[in-house]
Amino acid sequence: MKPLVAIYGPTHTGKTDLAKDLYSRFPSELISVDSVQIYKGFDIGSNKPDKKELQKYPHHLIDILDPNETFSVGDFKKRSIKILQDADKKSKLPIFVGGTMMYFYSLLEGLADLPERDDLIRAELECDLETFGLDYLFRRLEDLDPEAALVIHQNDRQRILRAIEVCLITNEKFSTIQKHAVKEKILKRKILTFAIVPQDRHQYKKELHERFKLMIKRGLIDEVRGCLLYTSPSPRDQ
C-alpha cells in the first residue's frame, strides 16, 4: 500500500505545482481537496486548472457537480475512500492537494459518527430556505441549539441545514452529539504531509492583490453573476 500524500496550505502558495511535479515523477492519482473546484462554472474564482492542464494532470473531484447541488464533508470522505481503493489496486500514489482543511481533517483525523442525511427532512428544510430565507433557518437553529448557533456563522447555509437536520433526526442538540460522538478513523496507512505557507506575508498579500485584479479582468464578476443565476437563491437571501 502506497502512502498518502497530503499537500495543503493557503491559496497561491504553489500547492498545485508541487502536486504536478510529484505526478510527473511517480505513478499517481491527483485528488483535489477544494470545496469550490468541485463545482462546474466556478473556474476563475477558484483558480481551477484549465482544460489543457487537466488533460495533462487529471484530477479527481473537479467539475463533478452543478452549482445547485450540495456536497458535504461526508460526501468527500466517501468519494475519497473509493479513489484510495482504486489507487491501491493500481499501485498508484494518492496525492491529495488543496486548501479546504475540513476535507483534509475528515481524512487525516476522522469524522464524528453522526446520523446519515435524511432526504425527507432535508427537502423540508430546503423548502423552508426557499420560502423564508436563511435568516429564518438560523433563528430556528438558535431555538433548537443555542450553543451550535454560537459557532456556526449565520451565512453558512450548509452547516446550518446540517445542524438542524441532526437535531430533528435525533431529537437532541447537534452540539451535544458532536461532543460525545466517536471519531471514525478511516486511514490506516503512512501519511506524508506538506504544509506550504508563505515566507514573506507582505509580498504574499501583494501577490494576492495582483492576482485578484487579474481575475477581475478575466471575468470574475460575470462568473459570479452566472453562478448566482444558476443557483436561483431565495430573494430573501440576496
Show which residues each predicted segment covers:
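Phosphate/pyrophosphate-binding catalytic cores of soluble transferases and nucleic-acid-acting enzymes
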Residues: 1-232
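A short, hydrophobic C-terminal helix/tail in secreted or cell-surface proteins
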Residues: 233-238
